[in-house]
Amino acid sequence: MESIIQQINQLRTSLRHHEYQYHVLDAPEVPDAEYDRLMGELRALESAHPELITADSPTQRVGAAPLAAFDQVRHEVPMLSLDNVFDEESFLAFYKRVQDRLKSSDPLTFCCELKLDGLAVSLLYEDGELVRAATRGDGTTGENITSNVRTIRAIPLRLTGDNIPRRLEVRGEVFMPQAGFEQMNEEARRKDGKIFANPRNAAAGSIRQLDPRITAKRPLTFFCYGVGLLEGGELPRSHWQRLMQFKDWGLPVSDRAKRCTGSDEVLAFYRQVEQDRTQLGFDIDGVVVKIDDIDLQETLGFVARAPRWATAFKFPAQEQITQVREVEFQVGRTGAITPVARLEPVLVAGVIVSNATLHNADEIERLGLRIGDTVIVRRAGDVIPQVVGVIAERRPADAREILFPQHCPVCGSDVERVEGEAVARCTGGLICAAQRKEALKHFVSRRALDVDGMGDKIIEQLVEKEYVKNPADLFRLSAGILTGLDRMGPKSAQNLVNALEKSKQTTFARFLYALGIREVGEATAANLAAHFGTLDKLLAADIEALKEVPEVGEIVAKHTRHFLDEELNQQVIQELVSDEIGINWPAPVVIVAEEIDSPFAGKTVVLTGSLSQLSRDEAKDRLTALGAKVSGSVSKKTDLVIAGEAAGSKLVKAQELGIEVIDEAEMIRLLGA
């Protein structure tokens, strides 16, 4: 028995430590899956030995102590957490338990919602006015974050509509959309500021700022999902209908919430959300399944720390612990040298991960990473796996320092790091085989010259056999040469020659994008093409002339001019448009915005968030056809922002600058006007 008591005490100590790191310091040391594993072990031991359960066990409470820096708030109705299930079998067991408690075999109706990965908050409205906001804290006592929450534009300061209760406590999640998170971290890197490991940490850190002016600059948003205190009014006796009522009063509710009857419908909802997860624009880690009927909720009641009528149906963990075996350095299209960690293979989010990006030397230093370290690796959707933390206490004695190369690992050229930039680059240009391969892959890609059938493996063979040294060489390939490549028969070779010939008919914007100029993406290439109209005018433009192009600042102008000034690049461009190769595009058609009868004519428009009725490309094309200039970033020159679902930092910046904002439905209406 002594060993069991010791094991239980060790688990409790470890869990309390991780709760403090997660909830109070916003600096978790282990992924959620590791915490869940420890909690599962403790629950199993306490279940087998109920006489050892104590009131202060982590299984008996919700979270960690509140920060002393904030005033404390006592929740009149405790903010409980949820029990978890991790697979379909466990969910079906939960479903059966609920049926058994209700003594009914009838299909159960649930309200199914997204399990947002943010920070749970309580919003208290009195006579429709927001008077207090608080964190969950330990479920009984939280932190008063009213000043910070008032800066979140998604949260109404006053409810609108009829029959608003005298006192209503709404509960929900403050979170940070992925686009806003990425932009915030990018800005922090440029200013040597704090880099957040993930959007959840960023949201928690932002909402707990002692200075609300800092919170106001963070791209936070909110969805509500429930109610706590209710006085002086009534709410529907259906959870789903309550969400709809909240929506009518002006509170944001996710449009992915759905009422499902029977276990099959719930499982179908779970699978669909898991499939759509990467398209949402914000992080979730599962779905929440709640009995819809409030009377049945009250019948089922609660256990010590969670309701019996709800569960969190979690997705496979997106973070896991593994070990760094080695670090290698890869060279990209623009010469950027990226360190890549070779890992002990580990299952993350349903995929075996053996490599993870380390970004740059600054990131290695920030992490304090060494070869041999035990690390937390994260994989979210289709995002490249990355190391987000080091578990320093597990560092072995023989851990090795990571030395960034002074010479390119591919061609041996000097490595250069420009002052103010985080990225180190190979100076070899197209003499570097790695840069050559990536530049050619970009040149033939779908959004560039769009050479059908010219895949990565073909490019790699062409470079390795030295058949191709620059983009112009692609158009000198014959079917005979191509037939000598692996898995390339005469018919496939001729098809590829035909595809190369077809790709010569392109647009000026695609041609510029295909060249691979640093910082010149599709939108910038389109702006350059529209502004200058011809290649000759662009080639003659100095930096000041380039800066006159919409969304082209000092940095992009310098990169563009530097690219065009390089002798090898000039030679390749002239070869590509020469009579020998003959890449060409239609003469520019000048669109006079004043002559177009459209509400978008002459306006600089920015799209942000996820669109449901049109793809991003379709929306851009239709807006451009109606005389708009579609930009990739918000500035004082922006006239209009179109905000889709989970719009992030661009929406926040537009609101700060007082720029007009419309939603997708209004855009669709105006497109048809």
From Swiss-Prot:
Keywords: DNA damage, DNA repair, DNA replication, Ligase, Magnesium, Manganese, Metal-binding, NAD, Zinc. SUPFAM superfamilies: BRCT domain, DNA ligase/mRNA capping enzyme, catalytic domain, Nucleic acid-binding proteins, RuvA domain 2-like. GO terms for molecular function: DNA binding; DNA ligase (NAD+) activity; metal ion binding. Residues 595-673 form the BRCT domain. One of its GO terms (cellular component) is cytosol. InterPro entries: BRCT_dom, BRCT_dom_sf, DisA/LigA_HHH, DNA_ligase, DNA_ligase_AS, DNA_ligase_CS, DNAligase_adenylation, DNAligase_N. CDD domains: BRCT_DNA_ligase_like, LIGANc. Disulfide bonds: none annotated. It catalyses: NAD(+) + (deoxyribonucleotide)n-3'-hydroxyl + 5'-phospho-(deoxyribonucleotide)m = (deoxyribonucleotide)n+m + AMP + beta-nicotinamide D-nucleotide. It holds the Pfam family DNA_ligase_OB. The keyword DNA repair applies. NAD(+) binds at D32, A33, E34, Y35, D36, S81, L82, E113, R136, E173, K290, K314. GO terms for biological process: DNA repair; DNA replication. Zn(2+) binds at C408, C411, C426, C432. Its cofactor is Mg(2+); Mn(2+). The active site is at K115. Its EC number is 6.5.1.2. Belongs to the NAD-dependent DNA ligase family. LigA subfamily. NCBIfam families: dnlj, PRK07956.1. DNA ligase that catalyzes the formation of phosphodiester linkages between 5'-phosphoryl and 3'-hydroxyl groups in double-stranded DNA using NAD as a coenzyme and as the energy source for the reaction. It is essential for DNA replication and repair of damaged DNA. This is DNA ligase. The lineage of its organism: Bacteria, Pseudomonadati, Pseudomonadota, Gammaproteobacteria, Enterobacterales.
